[in-house]
Each structure stands twice: as structure tokens, then as C-alpha cells.
């Protein structure tokens, strides 16, 4: 490759594309990315949106509204334990998805399998109370459901992050927006349902059925949308057909990444490197990159031009072969700072939220509900902020700003701990701090997840997929550490 390709040429870079230039196939992939984001956290959001049902699950499992619990510590912290079981399961399982044996499984199978497991999680939570069991059985059910949820989430999440890591960065931003919308949607429904139904034994049961039915419906819609995406031309251009057939992009190509073609490791110094050309421009760029390559099948290319099928111009290895040939360690070295940034965001967020951040007014019927809703709304605003160009670092070398912002969020620890001890007794303070806390969490996490697969040295689809998967693991690492710290802190507070 000639030396001029390693230096960004902004004059020749494709201009930003207008929304009306988007093809229907590309729009459909955006919709699927959004739906995948919603589905990713919908089960845990549905569970957390019915806290009364979870905190008193033993009443419904035993079918006894007057049952006196024997395992009081477990039920007092059931939400935290449930979340921790899922996180630990994911922390163990998600790295296993990077094994070569697992990477042989077609992506579509992984996606649909993960969704099915997440649906089973909700079915278990609803089926056991329908048949009835003991309090011990209720505890076992919660642990099993948490494990099932963690297993399904690890498979689905790692594949989604990896898959959309191979697409232009705006798809990751849209997917992250869906993750945030999932929380907003469940919080909004929680407020409506809480106002409409009484907090009685039967009222709480109806509330839980509403949340869980919504979850299953969304998962089913995503299931169908993913099956249809297998036949989507835009998806095929970026990562085969999700089923393990020949990829339409060769293993070393940068086509579809929304970047200028450059040598591996060449530094992308300006924001314009992330602009996304139209499909035709991608194909022209790919052809230009290979025009001097003697290995390219000229006769095949001429035949493709004759039939007008640009998607078959370069037929590379299968998407699974690309994945198996990718070095995990080298990818981790390339994304290490974005990995650390993303992990630390979730250390702080899950250390403080929801337990410490919303538990200071237990006698208030609405404080926790409204605080969670505000957090979720601001979180989704932060997650979609990277869709705005001015919210990105101005150059590649300014990525340190995202890492610094991640570590700067540690300031929320003393602010919210002091608030939880009522040194600042105002509920209004809690609402205001949730605005900043939620937006910063969503923005820094989304930017880290978006920039990770766009790092130096991540120069083909296989590396982008692995980078996206590793960024998903960073969420689990940070979330697990934060949740453990939260449990330890709240246990100490109960004793002292």
C-alpha cells in the first residue's frame, strides 16, 4: 500500500451523509440495532420495575399473603443479589464466547439463542408462583432465574456488541440509545401502573404481569427482526449474512467501517475519520483499495459489474473464519484505555445506583420511582449524545478526555454517600444529582463503547467484532465490582 494512504486526506474523505440518502436496508439495520439495545436490558429492567413483587416474591411463591419470611437478609437485599448473580454469571460466561470453539457458532444462532434464554428467565419467575413452592424454593427460583438471565444476557450482549462493532460507529450509538430507552420505558410504565393499581397483594401481582408481558413481547419482536436481517443487503455488506456463509467483505478490508482506508495502526487524527459514506462510496473505496492487488479475481469482478451486483465483488472468508483468525490479546492491547474507561463507569454507577442513590427516603412512596425515572431519562440522553458530532473528541489523541471523565465520576461517591446519610436532607437535591449522574453515566459509557472498536490497529471486521465483545466484558467487570462494593457498603451500614 502506498504511503499516502496512511495519512488522512480530509479533502477526499466522503462528506457526511444526510438522513434522506439512507437506503431502506440501512434504515432497517438501525431499527434492529435499536431493538437489540432495548432487548439487552429489558428483562432486568422489567424485574427492577416491579420491586415490590421481587421483595415479597416469597408471598407469591408460597401463595400465602401472610407468610412471615425466615431468610430476612436475602429478601431485604434480593434485588442486589439477583443483579450480582447475573453479573457474575455473565463475567464467567462472556469471556468464554471468545473461545474459538464458540466463535464457530453462527452469529444468528447466538443472537436467537441468547434471546430465547432471556425469555426463559421471565417464564421461570412467573411459572413458579403459579404452581406454588416453599420459601426455600422461592430463594432457589430467584437464584436460578438470575443465573439464566446472566447466561442469556452474556451470549446476546457479547454478540450484539461485537456485531455492531463491525458496523459504522453510529450503529453502536443507536444500539446504546436503545439500552437507555429500555430503562426509560419500564420506568414510565412503572409510574403509570403504580398510580393506577393499588400496592396490595393482587395489585402488585398484576403490576409484575404487565412488566413481564411487555418484556416477552419486545423480545419476540426482536427475535423476528433478527431473522429478517439475515437477508438484509446492508448487513451482508458488513458482516456476511450472520449465518456463517462467505462474508461480502474480505478479512483485511475496512469497508463499511466509515473510515478512510489506511494501513493497520495508522492514526486517525480527526473526527472526520468517523464520517460514514453511502453504500456506493463504500464499494468504490473497497474497489480502489484492491485495484493493484494481483490476487483479486478480475474476471469475477467484471462479471459482477455486468450483472450489477456489487455485493459479490469481493468474496472473502466466512465471518466465523475471520473471527477465529483474530488475536484477542492484540485487540485488547489496542482498546485497553476504552476498556478501562467503560469498566470504571459501571463501577461507580452500580456501586451507587440504585441502592445507595435511591434508598435514602424509604418512607416515601414516590422518591425512588421518580429518581430512577430521572436517572434513566438522563442516561438515555447521554447514550445518544455521541450521535452529535460536537460531542466527540476533536482528534484521536484527545480520547484521554473520555478516560478522564470516567475517573472524574468518582466525585459522585462522597456526594451520594453524604446524601444517603441525610447530611443533605432535601429530596430536590436527589433529583438534581440524578440528572448529572445519569447523563454522565450514559455519555461516557456510550463514547467508550463506540470508540473502542475504532481504535488504532482495529482494522478489519473480525477485530471489530472481538473489540465490541471485549467492551461488553468491560461492562460486566465494572458492574460486578460496583455491585460487590454496594453490597459490602450496605452491609456495613446496617451493622453500624
UniProtKB/Swiss-Prot annotation:
- Give membrane topology per the record: Multi-pass membrane protein
Topological domain ranges for the Extracellular compartment: 48-77, 129-135, 194-208, 358-365, 421-431, 486-496
Is Plastid among this UniProt entry's keywords?
no
Its UniProt entry gives the catalysed reaction(s) as: adenosine(in) = adenosine(out)
Q: Note whether Membrane occurs among the keywords.
A: yes
Q: Do you know which InterPro entries this protein is assigned to?
A: ENT1/ENT2, Eqnu_transpt, MFS_trans_sf
Q: Which residues lie on this side of the membrane: Cytoplasmic?
A: 1-26, 99-107, 157-172, 230-336, 387-399, 453-464
Instruction: List GO molecular-function terms, semicolon-separated.
Output: nucleoside transmembrane transporter activity
Its main localization is: membrane
Q: What family name appears in the similarity comment?
A: Belongs to the SLC29A/ENT transporter (TC 2.A.57) family.
Please report the name of this protein according to its UniProt entry. Adenosine transporter 1
